[in-house]
Amino acid sequence: MRSSPRLAAALLALLGSVASLPADPVTTPAALFTYMFDDGFSTDAVVSREFSEQGAVACSAVTTDWIGTRSHLSAAEIRGLQEAGWEILSHTRTHPHLPRLRAPRIEEELRLSREELEALGVRVRSLVYPYNQSNAAVERIARTYYRSARGGGYSFDTSATNPYALRSFSYSHDPEALRRTIDRAYAEKAWLIVYQHRVDVAVTIESRRGSFVPGEILEFSPSGSEALCQESAWSQIFGTLHFLPLTGSPRAGDLVTGQRSRASGKLGRIIFDDFAAIAGMLKYLRSRYPDMRIVTIDQGLDLLGIP
């Protein structure tokens, strides 16, 4: 039977309306962005204020044996991060190379770390592999206790990504490189996960006298600033100083003095400032890509339709 011209026109109109329907948001989501901090350093609690001020969230991957130790988060700080909208992830108990362990030990690391965090009143659904290392045996056990697990890989994630092999980029103190990676993720409508460890400021020190002590207060003159020393043996070798700003803004040329050690030196140049870089990154995302959602791992999995 031949179709009438009116029927053909109606069918074409119907097909055109179907073709113009929006794509399924689960299979073609807008770009997503997740920022993570590995190991549970106490600086997570400090930098969380910058995220809160800009209406953003992040994730902290906590190694439970380190909770409450020097330079690491306390139980109260971990709960505070969760209350601020951050997601807390397990990073095992002792931070081992999981693929080198036998199955019973892997199971113990993954199960007990989650139980210990939950005993603090923290909701835990995902894991971060120490050193970004896993294998089939590790993945199999991770599936028993977690919704997902993150490694490295320097590539983007999509709805097709294996949730127990989430990929990520390590932040290398290069804000320009990070912005270029954000640009690529947005263009590809991908999920970009970025991680780093401790947050601090690194500067060169000239005419150093004595050795600064980790944990001591540093005084900067004439700027009048104060900071918490995060010195290490490597800092001494390379002639640098790492610190956590407390008040003011230290400037090049300041005389730096340790309150306890009385060590001193002249502040040369700023090598990197993680706090300024994170603030700049969040402003860049908000201004350039307002529709690129800043999410936790759990939220990203939900938006991609990953169970």
Task: Outline where the language-model segments fall.
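Autoprocessing Asn-cyclization modules and mimics
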Residues: D200-I270
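C-terminal domain-boundary segment and adjacent tail
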Residues: D24-T28, E53, A61, G68, ...
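Bacterial N-terminal signal peptides that target proteins for export
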Residues: M1-A9
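Metal-dependent polysaccharide deacetylase catalytic core of the NodB/CE4 family, i.e.
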Residues: A30-F33, S52-S148, G152-L166, K189-D200
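Boundary/entry segment of secreted carbohydrate-active catalytic domains
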Residues: D24-V46
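A Trp-anchored, charged/polar loop motif used as the substrate-binding/catalytic surface
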Residues: S172-D183
